[in-house]
């Protein structure tokens, strides 16, 4: 999404605390979700924590959102934690999509596409007013292109 505002939470991870940092990043992304929103739910090991936190907020705080998953795994987890889901075609767009990335550079340009859900992720992202990307420093590269990507 061109012209997007970038917020930067920067941490350095050791192998022992990678999951804790992913959880922190996933939860921080939930700050962009408020009551009544239509939310694109991305795919990946960090977004998993976003989905878990949104499920907690629905159960404990009464958060009222509708999610649109980008993959079967995301759909299954969202249903498991109680996030109501809809098809993108049934909504008038999305307020925010939260997704991961395969790599990003110091200017916060990014590449996605290493996973199996790329097409659906692109469609959902284009339908959203805002995109929040969650990633840890292991995904940062000096020059984009280090991650092998399939060509569509």
PLM features per residue range, with description:
Residues 54-58:
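Active-site catalytic pocket residues across diverse enzymes, especially alpha/beta-hydrolases
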